[in-house]
Amino acid sequence: MTKRLLILEDGTIFEGEPFGADIDVTGEIVFNTGMTGYQESITDQSYNGQILTFTYPLIGNYGINRDDYESISPTCKGVVVSEVSRLASNWRKQMTLDAFLKIKGIPGISGIDTRALTKIIRQHGTMKATMADDGDSIQHLKDQLRATVLPTNTIEQVSTKTAYPAPGIGKNIVLVDFGLKHSILREFSKRQCNITVVPFNITAEEVLQLNPDGLMLSNGPGNPEDLPEALDMIRGVQGKIPIFGICMGHQLFSLANGAKTCKMTFGHRGFNHAVREIATGRIDFTSQNHGYAVERSSLPDTLMVTHEDINDKTVEGVKHRDFPAFSVQFHPDAAPGPHDASYLFDEFLEMIDSWRCTSK
């Protein structure tokens, strides 16, 4: 059987068995520490352009089902596992992980020492990597990898091109799609909200023309500093309607208010990150997927830190002191992961009610 190679930017080479699509790819290699939820992770558009390493030793044992998609068209570049289950056993299963990746054109590699790989990423940071069959010249692959420039328009690639509705009978929410997870839509639909999903480059004027009760800024891939148009939109809407941001939305909200962001060494990607709510001391276990963070020292006086990561003190939430607006770095929608923080969707809707009363 043909072997598949995983070549890192620092020259490290791993050899494993191929599964999924039979193509060569290059992307940023990252790792996810979740024990389950591989379908949700692979279909999360926040992984656009990235080669996704799962640290859990066995992936694929319950297959792929019709319910757990976070997007219909996954855009991660590749999947790296220690062992892939070629058989899948679950009453909801539609197909195996191998079959799914073949259909979606995503290559996988198994038989990799993912512990050793994760240690390299933790020590040296995320880096470029190439997955290719071992019939290719290794030196040629290394030269190609070194010369590859990863794209920066990752959000443009995954955002909706046109606005579309998700009808409901409740509050009107404009949801900006920076790489939207379906679970965010589901959380608002549970609460009967009337949602309009809009492209990433919508203007403040266009948002306000939709007469929304609130603005939701979704998750998404890449560097938030690559979206100056989104910052202008947030500044134009802020103070006129309540705002809630998640993940990329959190970073954009912070940037729009004068804070700075920085690239993390290896990021937070997993489903068991403990976060403290500073006001109450409450601890929530959260789902996270981000490679950038808001710099605490850069926060203006108008923003207050509401949540922080217990382990490394990363800013995990902020709130505006003057306007009805807040954001969190983690995913209260979970999918996958714990639902400890799903109450934040209710707090956003309560904020809308309060704003209506005070702005009359």
Curated annotation (Swiss-Prot):
Pfam family, one: CPSase_sm_chain
Pathway: Amino-acid biosynthesis; L-arginine biosynthesis; carbamoyl phosphate from bicarbonate: step 1/1; Pyrimidine metabolism; UMP biosynthesis via de novo pathway; (S)-dihydroorotate from bicarbonate: step 1/3
GO biological process terms on file: 'de novo' pyrimidine nucleobase biosynthetic process; 'de novo' UMP biosynthetic process; glutamine metabolic process; L-arginine biosynthetic process
Enzyme class: ligase
Residue ranges crossing the lipid bilayer per the database entry: none
Catalysed reactions listed for this entry: hydrogencarbonate + L-glutamine + 2 ATP + H2O = carbamoyl phosphate + L-glutamate + 2 ADP + phosphate + 2 H(+)
Record keywords, A-Z: Amino-acid biosynthesis, Arginine biosynthesis, ATP-binding, Glutamine amidotransferase, Ligase, Nucleotide-binding, Pyrimidine biosynthesis
Enzyme active site: 247 (nucleophile), 331, 333
Gene3D superfamilies: 3.40.50.880, Carbamoyl-phosphate synthase small subunit, N-terminal domain (3.50.30.20)
InterPro entries reported in the protein's UniProt record: Anth_synth/Amidotransfase (IPR050472), CarbamoylP_synth_ssu (IPR006274), CarbamoylP_synth_ssu_N (IPR002474), CarbP_synth_ssu_N_sf (IPR036480), Class_I_gatase-like (IPR029062), CPSase_GATase1 (IPR035686), GATASE (IPR017926)
Start and end residues of each Glutamine amidotransferase type-1 domain: 172-358
GO molecular function: ATP binding; carbamoyl-phosphate synthase (glutamine-hydrolyzing) activity; glutaminase activity
Family under the similarity heading: Belongs to the CarA family.
PANTHER family with a match to the protein in the record: CARBAMOYL-PHOSPHATE SYNTHASE SMALL CHAIN, MULTIFUNCTIONAL TRYPTOPHAN BIOSYNTHESIS PROTEIN-RELATED
Description of how the protein assembles with itself and partners: Composed of two chains; the small (or glutamine) chain promotes the hydrolysis of glutamine to ammonia, which is used by the large (or ammonia) chain to synthesize carbamoyl phosphate. Tetramer of heterodimers (alpha,beta)4.
Name of the featured protein: Carbamoyl phosphate synthase small chain
Annotated source species: Streptococcus pyogenes serotype M1
Gene, per the UniProt record: carA
